[in-house]
Regions:
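Flexible cytoplasmic inter-helical loops of multi-pass small-molecule transporters
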Residues: 152-175, 365-370
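Helix-loop junctions at membrane interfaces in 12-TM secondary transporters
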Residues: 57-74, 266-279
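C-terminal transmembrane helical hairpin of 12-TM major facilitator-type secondary transporters
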Residues: 249-294
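Hydrophobic alpha-helical transmembrane segments
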Residues: 65-79, 104-162, 225-226, 328-329, ...
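A single, central transmembrane helix in multi-pass transporters
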Residues: 131-138, 175-237, 339
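Small-residue hotspots at the loop-to-helix junctions and early N-terminal turns
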Residues: 4-11, 107, 217-224, 312
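Substrate-agnostic recognition of the 12-TM MFS/MFS-like secondary transporter fold
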Residues: 14-32, 37-48, 70-129, 194-202, ...
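Structural signature of the two symmetry-related core transmembrane helices
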Residues: 40-56, 141, 250-265, 343-347
Length: 371
């Protein structure tokens, strides 16, 4: 990790993973609803394996600019395949469990994902030190075989509950947006705005860690682990209160937005390392709660026939917004500094979140309409 790393290069790497959702998530959702979530899920997991394998091959076979291009291409392909995987997995959950368990089951994925983020950096660092980059990336690629085997051989979904869309104009993403209703439209809009303003820490984590902790590789691991620990905490809170939180969607989303905004403002005036790590914990909790809440609310509040497309719209809101956020904040960092970027984003996010809470906090989500 080098403090002189170009913020735009860091943001571009995350954008390569996140921005494909703006283009791919819509078609991914449409395909999931048309051909079936299990089929798309397996296909996307094989694609993830191939894309990650491409990155593993880049290290021993290429060097210089060719290696950089191949690694960025691998990241881009992982982002594309991941958009299909996440879309299909969300709808797949609804045929694995019943309606009463769906909310808790969906939010459990956030917890599991963030546990992976907590233990992943130290495991990845150990693999890198013990085996080198080629084997480390190769093992990472091979890890995709486990979920493939789970879906193909171990999980037993009730496929009779899945409702597929038919070909035609009513099966598109635009139709899902119109039919989901004003509450879910508002949920997607608020999530997109908050992510566009403040979801930049995944891409700029190396730069933030350098400013807060220092330039040692272990400092980045510590920073990302604290973020992940906060994300786990936010996910657990949402999981244990999924019914109550989803009933008041704008109060929930706005509340998580306020937590993130206050933490970002704290980062802009951090008096020390301990305080900065505490703020990083809150940023992890707030953003995880926001993203998981959006996913939860749009799934349980929509009909089974459009849940693939709603998952696609959710991805566009938070990953598309996040990919753009990193690039915008990188421009602020280059023109001023990181503290200014935190202050600006935290202030805007706080105003946006409080305004939505003030105007729509009483809005409620209709009960689950289908299994």
């Amino acid at each position: 990790m080098d403090g002189s790393a170009d913020p735009f290069l860091l943001a571009l790497n995350f954008a390569a993973l996140a921005l494909p959702t703006l283009i791919i998530s819509g078609p991914a959702g449409v395909r999931t609803d048309r051909v079936g979530c299990e089929r798309v899920l397996v296909q996307s997991q094989w694609a993830l394996l191939a894309a990650a394998g491409l990155g593993a091959l880049a290290i021993p076979l290429f060097d210089g600019m060719a290696q950089v291009i191949l690694l960025l291409s691998s990241t881009l392909l992982v982002g594309i395949a991941g958009a299909y995987e996440l879309t299909a997995r969300n709808k797949y959950c609804s045929i694995l469990v019943g309606p009463k368990q769906l909310g808790s089951y969906l939010t459990s994925f956030s917890v599991v994902f963030n546990v992976g983020k907590l233990v992943g950096p130290p495991i990845g660092g150990w693999l890198l030190a013990a085996t080198g980059p080629t084997w480390a990336l190769g093992i990472d690629a091979a890890s995709y075989l486990l979920p493939i085997a789970s879906v193909m051989f171990f999980l037993r979904p009730d496929s009779t509950r899945e409702i597929r869309s038919t070909n035609g104009k009513n099966a598109g993403l635009t139709n899902a947006w119109r039919e989901c209703g004003p509450t879910l439209q508002g949920v997607l809009t608020l999530t997109a705005v908050l992510c566009l303003v403040g979801f930049f820490h995944p891409g700029l984590a190396p730069l933030i860690a350098f400013e807060v902790l220092g330039g040692k590789p272990t400092d980045l691991g510590l920073f990302t682990s604290v973020l992940a620990a906060g994300s786990i905490a936010g996910g657990l809170v949402l999981q244990r209160n999924s019914a109550q939180f989803s009933y008041r969607p704008f109060l929930t989303l706005g509340g998580f937005g306020v937590i993130t905004a206050i933490a970002q403002l704290g980062m802009s005036r951090s008096p020390g390392v301990a305080f900065s790590l505490a703020m990083a914990f809150l940023i992890g909790a707030g953003t995880a709660g926001l993203l998981s809440s959006c996913n939860l609310i749009t799934q349980i509040g929509s009909d089974q026939v459009m849940r693939g497309r709603m998952a696609g719209l959710s991805q566009i809101a938070f990953l598309g917004g996040g990919g753009l956020s990193g690039l915008l904040v990188a421009a602020v960092v280059v023109s001023s500094n990181l503290s200014t970027a935190f202050a600006l984003c935290g202030g805007i996010s706080l105003v946006v979140a409080l305004r939505w809470i003030a105007t729509r906090c009483k809005a409620t989500l209709a009960p689950i309409r289908s299994a």
